[in-house]
Amino acid sequence: MEPSSETGMDPPLSQETFEDLWSLLPDPLQTVTCRLDNLSEFPDYPLAADMTVLQEGLMGNAVPTVTSCAVPSTDDYAGKYGLQLDFQQNGTAKSVTCTYSPELNKLFCQLAKTCPLLVRVESPPPRGSILRATAVYKKSEHVAEVVKRCPHHERSVEPGEDAAPPSHLMRVEGNLQAYYMEDVNSGRHSVCVPYEGPQVGTECTTVLYNYMCNSSCMGGMNRRPILTIITLETPQGLLLGRRCFEVRVCACPGRDRRTEEDNYTKKRGLKPSGKRELAHPPSSEPPLPKKRLVVVDDDEEIFTLRIKGRSRYEMIKKLNDALELQESLDQQKVTIKCRKCRDEIKPKKGKKLLVKDEQPDSE
């Protein structure tokens, strides 16, 4: 008896039966071709902006390359988009927490205080561009080192309190899209934010930065001057513009700015702008030499007067001549009176009064 009759089940499918079933399935290539051909029946809808940028980046002929140098350049480069930086003018009062000196191209700020940076461009950069801020040492003997916070301030941050790594000097305030990077080749720290166009009625974009360590901290900057490099880059890392300025993190920004500006003007041979001299109107007459005689009696001191107008001069001259004549007459009267008094004096007991330069009679 056959097994099929005993169990009451159909025999298993053979290889020929499986091939017959597979041939009944539609061809996947033909299905995709039909679906692509059916796209012509739908109206043309524009792609999203993000998709357009993505296709341009993927289908472009030029392959973007990111340049990473051990010593970043500090030369200003506006680029074809005209990158410019501006700062708020806060003066040099003692109460300011952040002030910028255009003469020195230097920013003075306090620890962990807000430093508004105004970014301006002449034409909008490509979509998805970023602004990168990097701190480097200014002097050549220190430029190879990475700018970091001192161990004291680095340990003062509680884990999870700040999104930035504890060793990073710079922070971005009020922007949740900011992200912090460390270069794999040089180890330099940087903070990046997406570039956002100016708001309606404004000409610049504001980015709020913080410096989280003093310039005088031991183990950190250790009184070594630093520079901040602001670069405008594409999403692929291509440089579009660069600006640079010096930074000093101190306790009294206004005082330090005045001191450094005065020292700078002295080196250039100019007078500090702290005090202004009174402006005197120009005079056509040549200045007369000042004459002063050192005498004992105040009445014998000689003064020089500058008189405006010929008539006034003649009148005062006549008055002066009259006073001098009166003085000479008074002296003559005193001399005559003294002589008369001397002649009226008679010697006692018949003796002749001796006069000066007169010899006595010989006996």
UniProtKB/Swiss-Prot annotation:
The note describing how and how many cofactors are bound reads: Binds 1 zinc ion per subunit.
Q: Where is this motif: Bipartite nuclear localization signal?
A: 275-292
**Site (Interaction with DNA): residue numbering on this chain:** 94
Q: In which tissues is it expressed?
A: Ubiquitous.
Q: Where are the annotated segments for Basic (repression of DNA-binding)?
A: 344-356
Which residues lie within the region annotated Interaction with DNA?
A: 248-255
Region Transcription activation (acidic): start and end of each range?
Answer: 1-29
The Swiss-Prot or TrEMBL record annotates one GO molecular function as: DNA-binding transcription factor activity, RNA polymerase II-specific
Protein name per the record? Cellular tumor antigen p53
